[in-house]
């Protein structure tokens, strides 16, 4: 750590503020920034700020895609975790940069909650070395967990390169036949209660699972409460 990075632990600062705190010239400041790989610059003109990257488990950048109404995924942004803890810089596909003190607002609905969220948390806790209590997960824990989430996303968001690759290579699921629903639903309900299957990030406390099944009006993705 250096004096520069120590100052940035509290959050983004402008060049004039940093130069004043460090009592250095513009030339010296430029050299300091050039030597610090984790110091990033964002904004334009007088709105330019400097921030300190905060890699999480070796990850500095988390790409995000948005799935449109036609089922096509489009690159939306890159998220870079920064200091202070929980904050991030989001660079849109159009180059627009925005600072967030927590999860970007459009991803907050993806935070695990309710019955399925707890089941998902228990399933991933041992794998990711996280606490089983999803209420104790920090912002970076949630983002990291979302990169390995293999269910269906609320709002059509794909977080992480791995999920994008799974999306574009996924095969269309086979619908549960009408005459086999009872057997399949009993097993899915049992698995859901055991925390072994999570097909959605839907919230709520009532036990439930999601699946793709035949219905009188055609094959549909359904949310089954029991």
Q: What label would you give each PLM region?
A:
Residues 2, 8-226:
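Phosphate/dinucleotide-binding and metal-coordinating scaffold of catalytic cores
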């Amino acid at each position: 750590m250096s004096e520069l990075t120590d100052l940035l632990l509290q959050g983004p600062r402008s060049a004039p503020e940093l130069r004043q705190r460090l009592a250095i010239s513009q030339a010296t400041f430029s050299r300091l920034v050039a030597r610090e790989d984790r110091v990033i610059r964002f904004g334009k003109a007088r709105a330019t700020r400097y921030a300190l990257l905060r890699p999480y488990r070796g990850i500095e950048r988390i790409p995000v895609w948005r799935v449109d109404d036609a089922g096509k995924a489009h690159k939306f942004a890159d998220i870079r975790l920064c200091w202070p803890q929980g904050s991030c810089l989001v660079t849109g596909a159009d180059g627009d940069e925005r600072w967030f003190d927590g999860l970007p607002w459009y991803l907050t609905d993806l935070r695990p909650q309710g019955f399925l969220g707890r089941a998902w948390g228990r399933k991933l806790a041992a794998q990711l070395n996280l606490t089983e209590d999803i209420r104790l997960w920090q912002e970076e824990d949630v983002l990291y967990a979302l990169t390995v989430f293999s269910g269906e996303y609320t709002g059509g968001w794909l977080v992480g390169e791995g999920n994008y690759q799974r999306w574009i290579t996924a095969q269309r699921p086979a619908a549960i036949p009408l005459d086999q629903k009872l057997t399949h639903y009993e097993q899915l309900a049992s698995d859901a209660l055991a925390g072994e299957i999570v097909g959605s990030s839907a919230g709520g406390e009532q036990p439930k699972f999601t699946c793709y099944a035949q219905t009188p009006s055609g094959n549909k993705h359904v949310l089954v409460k029991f």
